[in-house]
Amino acid sequence: MPRAPNRAPTTPPHTATAIPLPPPPFKSSPSPPIFLNMDIFSLIGLLLALVALVGGSILKGAGVSSLWSSAAFVIVILGTVAAILVHTPPPVFKRALSIARWVIRPPTNEQQALVGQIVDWSNIARKQGLLGLEPLVADQQDPFLKKGLQMLVDGLEPEAIRHMLEIDLTSQEHQDTAAAKVFEAMGVYAPTLGIIGAVFGLIAVMKNLADPSKLGHGIAAAFTATIYGIASANLFFLPIASKLKSVIGGRSREREMIIEGLIAIAQGENPRNIESRLAGFLH
């Protein structure tokens, strides 16, 4: 009986072992349209301040034209700017101009999303180690967050990370607060310059005592500078300074939350504990 030809043993096809992939890097939600990122209440407040001045002048019978005085503008507004230029170092003045927009468009606040991001990082660190976070460093847009994550990947001690980030936090907070105080100082100088403008106006009136027909108009024009000084200080400069300080405080609290989250990851805390700890910053 003929034997069947020898056949090479069949081997099952090779199947690649599935390698678990790390979760995709956190990406913040798309930036909302400009008008949605605006602080509507601040915008309404500034507009109401103008309406209050113009409307009050009209209701009092003074008219809109009485609010304009080139001499008062030069003495009060330009004088205030001149005093601030002498008062403030150039870097602080430039910073003040750059953060003035925060009154209408404050920095985006995504603290809830940031908590989720840090919790995701803690899960990656528990499964893959701190080096598993290295691919995520380049994706960070916030320099403070990027620096902290890089130090975490580099394996620095938790206290070293805290010390370095707190120095950055304190330095940035000091710079921004000094910039906000520029508007606070303008609110101090403007009323005083308004009084100076009124005195100049009264001096001009005293020179025309021989012509009684000019006295009423001259006295009214003299007090326009006082209006400029008091109104600009209490309706614009001082509220702007207070709003900027509030925004700066919020940014500092957000960075404190980042520091606590990164330290917790470095210490190997449970992600649930980290989430509970950071939730306290959201209240």
Regions found by a protein language model. Name each.
Residues T10:
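Detector for the Zn2+-coordinating histidines of canonical Cys2His2
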Residues P13-T15:
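Intrinsic low-complexity, disordered N-terminal segments enriched in polar/charged/small residues
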